[in-house]
């Protein structure tokens, strides 16, 4: 037993002295390998009497367990030390100046920039962000939004459908972010105040349309909500987003299945040598659609239209990004052209005028 204790002490000392994983592996082989010291002791158990085997076997197995645990602990320690050493050698001095060559500097994509601006503006008004899946059911995308059977938007030339299931139902790529509003109304009790930014899909592609595009929609459900509230929100948004103190807006009657009454919104602008200036001029430019939530939609989502009413609006993020920053072709937003991004993108450390104004 004294020899076993001395052997264990020696092996533990060798483990503690191992300076790297290779040295530690050598100690493991010398102790627990096929020809290792402890393995040799275990091989002698077969020649012992049952009484000796019971006593000696327990002692040898205990020594093996102690050595195994010590090896594991030392290996973990060495691994962490090696990682710390590597990380120390890879330290980046964040006080170093940026690369001077603009081509070597990354850019924030205009769509990411505009999404940040949108969420900042509406968050300042007390809106939360709601999200939902890109793949939707016909029920959430159309039926609960008061789209009757046979509505043109249900046709294959507008909507990307998946193959029918065995029961005949079909999933689809959402054609607007309105299904997120449906999910919100089904899962939350009023009052509700959310915006729903995200990707949407329609079978269309030209200079001003792409099969995948981005939308942001807003929804307010409460007692006593009315068009005056909607107009104020949209007016404040346009002033903040386009960074114009005085902006004139025009609300025109329109039709959307999910709102009644439905309106389209134009803002006053002046077109000058290919540029659009807002807040001046005699031209008008359509930017979004809106209206009071249709009672049928409220009922389909479990909200009593006799108690609550609400309003909603929606706009294309890609479109308003093009209007604000002077981009002429929607398709260029998705072409990953570094030259285009260097021209229209934003430097990561630049503080946008909008966010700067809100933070101060």
Curated annotation (Swiss-Prot):
Q: Which PROSITE patterns match?
A: AA_TRNA_LIGASE_II
Name the cofactor(s): Mg(2+)
What EC designation does it have? 6.1.1.20
Major location (coarse): cytoplasm
| Superkingdom, natural source | Bacteria
- Quaternary structure and interacting proteins, as annotated: Tetramer of two alpha and two beta subunits.
What are the entry keywords? Aminoacyl-tRNA synthetase, ATP-binding, Cytoplasm, Ligase, Magnesium, Metal-binding, Nucleotide-binding, Protein biosynthesis
Instruction: Supply the gene name.
Output: pheS
- Protein name as annotated: Phenylalanine--tRNA ligase alpha subunit
Reaction(s) the record says it catalyses: tRNA(Phe) + L-phenylalanine + ATP = L-phenylalanyl-tRNA(Phe) + AMP + diphosphate + H(+)
InterPro entries found in the cross-reference section? aa-tRNA-synth_II, aa-tRNA-synth_II/BPL/LPL, Phe-tRNA-synth_IIc_asu, Phe-tRNA_ligase_II_N, Phe_tRNA_ligase_alpha1_bac, Phenylalanyl-tRNA_Synthase, tRNA-bd_arm
User: What is the free-text note on the cofactor?
Assistant: Binds 2 magnesium ions per tetramer.
The keyword Amino-acid biosynthesis appears for this protein:
no
């Amino acid at each position: 037993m004294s020899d076993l204790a001395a052997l264990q002490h020696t092996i533990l000392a060798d483990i503690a002295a191992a300076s790297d994983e290779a040295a530690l592996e050598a100690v493991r082989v010398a102790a627990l390998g096929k020809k290792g010291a402890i393995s040799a002791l275990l091989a002698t158990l077969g020649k012992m009497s049952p009484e000796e085997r019971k006593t000696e076997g327990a002692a040898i197995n205990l020594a093996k367990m102690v050595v195994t645990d010590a090896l594991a602990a030392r290996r973990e320690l060495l691994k962490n030390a090696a990682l710390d050493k590597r990380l120390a050698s890879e330290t980046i001095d964040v006080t170093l100046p940026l690369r001077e060559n603009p081509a070597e500097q990354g850019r924030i994509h205009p769509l990411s920039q505009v999404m940040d601006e949108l969420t900042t503006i509406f968050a300042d008004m007390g809106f939360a962000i709601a999200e939902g899946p890109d793949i939707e059911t016909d029920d959430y995308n159309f039926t609960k939004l008061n789209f009757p059977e046979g509505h043109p938007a249900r046709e294959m030339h507008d909507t990307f459908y998946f193959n029918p299931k065995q029961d005949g139902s079909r999933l689809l790529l959402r054609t607007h972010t309105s299904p997120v509003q449906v999910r919100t109304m089904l899962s939350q009790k009023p009052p509700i105040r959310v915006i729903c930014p995200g990707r949407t899909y329609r079978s269309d592609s030209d200079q001003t349309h792409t099969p995948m595009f981005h939308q942001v929609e807003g929804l307010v459900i409460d007692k006593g909500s009315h068009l005056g509230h909607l107009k104020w929100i949209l007016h404040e948004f346009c002033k903040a987003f386009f960074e114009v103190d005085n902006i004139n807006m025009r609300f025109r009657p329109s039709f959307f299945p999910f709102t009644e009454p439905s309106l389209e919104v134009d803002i006053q602008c002046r077109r000058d040598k290919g540029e659009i200036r807002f807040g001046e001029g005699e031209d008008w430019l359509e930017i979004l659609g809106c209206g009071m939530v249709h009672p049928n939609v409220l009922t389909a989502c479990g909200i009593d239209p006799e108690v609550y009413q609400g309003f909603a609006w929606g706009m294309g993020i890609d479109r308003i990004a093009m209007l604000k920053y002077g981009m002429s072709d929607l398709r260029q937003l998705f072409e990953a052209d570094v030259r285009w991004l260097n021209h229209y993108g934003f430097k990561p450390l630049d503080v946008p005028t909008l966010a700067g104004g809100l933070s101060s």
